[in-house]
Structure formats: C-alpha cells, structure tokens
Regions:
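A short acidic, helix-capping loop that chelates divalent metal ions and anchors anionic groups
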Residues: 88-89
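Glycine-rich NAD(P)-binding loop of Rossmann-like domains
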Residues: 92-103
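Active-site/ligand-binding-proximal alpha/beta "capping" segment
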Residues: 101, 119, 128-129, 133-134
C-alpha cells in the first residue's frame, strides 16, 4: 500500500481511522509516501480497484469520499468532504460535510484540490493545479483540450 514514487519522497504516511468509521478497498490500492489519510468518526472512505495515489496527498473524510476503479492521482493532491474544521453558529455545530464521489478511470493532476460536494464523472481528467469546488458530474469524459475552459470559465 505504500508504494509509488520510489525514492522521491521521504515523508511518513499517516492513515488514521476513527471509531465507527469504514474504509473499503475494492482491490489493489497504492498510497505513496508522505500522504495523510484521515477517516473521522462515522465517515466512509472507499477505494476502487487499482487506485493509485502519488506522494504527499491529503484525504480527509468527515462523511463520505469514494474513488472509482482505476483512479490515478498525482503529487500533492487534497481531497476534502468538509471545511477542515467545525463551524459554530449560535452555539451549535453546523453540518459542513458533503460527499465527494470520483468516478472510474479518472486522472487527477498534481497539486489539484477537490472540495466537498463534488461529483466527478467517469473518465474525467483534472488538470494540474485546479481547485474543483462544485459538482462537475456532468462533464464530458474527454476533459482534455478544448473542454479545459469548462473548469476555468468561472475564474476568468
């Protein structure tokens, strides 16, 4: 499970699973050195068959994160189904987690960030350095070339 990027990274990998949480491996998975995986109490994290995550990635599940079969992730990727900390409003904790679902045969470029509530369609390629902050589940499967503008358009 701790393969990939042989000799490139020396950081320690942390895999923290809290009580009453679930981690599902549906086949072989590789999570490279220097990565941090945290599955909070009551959360579910599932990996499809032939999942590969390169070095220095961060996956934090408060509710649900799922990766489809043959998903490939580059270096230094962050996947969060939450805001990173609780938000209090009028003395009460507000629910801030939304599921993240990444389809089969997806390729996520290095330095990308996938935030809460995102659904990524099967066959999608996320370019280097992108922040995906809303549901792109409807994207065409050939996300290269002229389709690149779909992600960048809200920021231009």
């Amino acid at each position: 499970m701790w393969g990939g990027s042989y000799g490139l990274r020396q950081g320690k990998t942390r895999f923290c699973v809290f009580d009453d949480s679930t981690v599902i491996f549906n086949g072989k998975a590789c999570i490279s050195k220097g990565s941090n995986v945290v599955v909070r109490q009551g959360a579910t994290l599932s990996f499809g068959q032939d999942f590969f995550c390169n070095a220095d990635c961060n996956i934090l599940a408060n509710k649900e994160i799922s990766f489809g079969d043959s998903t490939l992730m580059g270096w230094n990727i962050t996947v969060l189904d939450n805001d990173g900390h609780p938000i209090y409003w009028k003395g009460e904790v507000q629910e801030t987690s939304l599921p993240v679902r990444i389809g089969e045969h997806c390729w996520i470029g290095s330095h990308a960030t996938i935030l809460k509530g995102v659904n990524i369609a099967t066959g999608t390629i996320i370019p280097y350095g992108c922040t995906i902050h809303k549901d792109f589940g409807y994207l065409p499967q050939d996300f290269l070339g002229y389709h690149f503008w779909i992600v960048l358009e809200p920021f231009l």
